[in-house]
Amino acid sequence: AFPAAMRELQARGLIEPIKEAIAAGRPYLGICLGLQLLFERSEEGEGAEGLGILAGTVKRFSFEHSVFRIPHSALKIPHMGWNQVSSDKRQATSDKRCPLLEGIPEGSFVYFVHSYYGDPTDRSVVALEAEYGVRFAAMVWKNNLFATQFHPEKSQSVGLQLLNNFVNL
């Protein structure tokens, strides 16, 4: 999906307008692939380059070297279903909390459908994390840029609160 989406953005002339809108301070909300495309590159497709707005790589889940003691057969790819998210430690101790998380309890459950996850070089952009064989960025936030790996539109009241917070920025 990543290489095809980048080709489509290129064909429609949308890469520069997206970058310009984000640079101009317009709120951006990326969902699932919309988070992944923000990164420099992806393991999905050889040499797949992203928008390069966030430093880092989109990686495929691989449980061969998992630090968690979970049988490989217990974790299926794609990661599909409900999973708990928590604030990144730096976000939790910061005076400045992501405005899209207002009214969302710590440890909420959200709905995921993905085989790849963004791995940012700068961990300070991670607003929420989840675990699925590895800890990964479930949500990133930098200034006016917000993006979720999970699907807020499928995450019931938590997702609706997040979307409402975005609309009311």
Residue positions per predicted region:
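Cysteine-nucleophile active-site neighborhood
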Residues: 1-66, 72-80
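Amide-donor transfer/coupling interface in amidating biosynthetic enzymes
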Residues: 23, 57-169
